[in-house]
Amino acid sequence: WSLTPERFEQYLKTAFDCWHQDAMRGKKRYHRYFDNLLLMLNGQPPEACGMLGTCGMQYVVEADGSVYPCDFYMLDQYKLGNLNTDTLAQIDARRKEIGFIEQSCAVDEKCKICKWYQLCRGGCRRDRDYYQDGIGRNYYCAAYERFFEYAWPKLGEVYEEVIRG
């Protein structure tokens, strides 16, 4: 990993502070992660797939027609087929066969009892996949925990500001 959890935490806090300050001045800027947290606070699903808690059904198509289940999994072992030679039904059958989405539903036991799980939801599969044998806790778990502790009160302030709009 080139980005350590400590550096990621530092980035989250620094970017959040800038985002929060702008929002409190009435000049809220869009930041995908933070704005998705606002959606979640408002009872809506996040639009970012890495914040859903499970992988969604999507396909990435390369120029040569190769199809993969995610842009982070464009590896031979996850290749679902090729649009030049396979039907969509065959490609979808392969997705089901490898269980790509189903595997992403696995939740670590520690995650189930974490007070931030409803915001974190385990994060993107790619950050859980290679960290442990199989899909376990997110590599950046500690960074997210400390970020949520830090940002939670201010996130509520931005939420109230946006709702009053």
Task: Mark where each language-model region is.
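Radical SAM enzyme [4Fe-4S]-AdoMet core and its adjacent flexible, acidic
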Residues: W1-T54, V60-A63, M74-L83, G136
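Flexible mid-to-C-terminal extensions adjoining Fe-S/redox cofactors in radical SAM and related proteins
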Residues: M74-G165
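Generic hydrophobic-segment detector
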Residues: T54-C55, I113
